[in-house]
Amino acid sequence: MKRLFLASEFFVVADHIFENFIKEKRLKVLFITTSSELHKEECSWVVKDRAAFVRGGFEVKDFTITGKSKDEITEAFASVDIIHSVGGNTFYYLKQIQLTDSADLYRDAVTNKNK
C-alpha cells in the first residue's frame, strides 16, 4: 500500500513514521532538494531531514529536477522506494515541475500507477 506523509519538519516526526509505518530498512530514498535551491547555503531542515533518513537506515540519493529531462526524472522515480521532497520555495519547485513537464509523474507516484 502506498502512503503519503505531509510534514513541515520531517525530521521531527521521522522516528514515529519509521516505527509505526515503515518497517523495512535499507529502502532507497530519492531526496529531492529542488525547493531549497534558491537558498545560498544548505538549509538546516534539509540537513536534518537527510540525517533522519540516514539514521533510520535508509539509502539516500540527493536529486534535483532542475535541468533534468522528464525521462531522467522518470528513471529516478522508478529507481527508489520513497520519494521525499524537502521544503523551501514551493513556487520555484512548481515552476521546475512545469518546466520539466513532470506533474503527471508525481501524480502517478501517489496514485500507484507506476508501481
Q: For each of these PLM feature ranges, what is it?
A:
Residues 1-86:
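N-terminal beta1-alpha1 cap of cysteine-dependent amidohydrolase-like domains
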Residues 84-87, 110-115:
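Catalytic nucleophile loop
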Residues 81-85, 92, 107:
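Short, contiguous, well-ordered secondary-structure segments
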Residues 90-100:
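Glycine/threonine-rich flexible loop motifs
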Residues 99-107:
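Active-site glycine-rich loop that binds ribose-phosphate moieties when present
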Residues 52, 108-109:
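Alpha-helical scaffold elements within enzyme catalytic domains, especially in hydrolases
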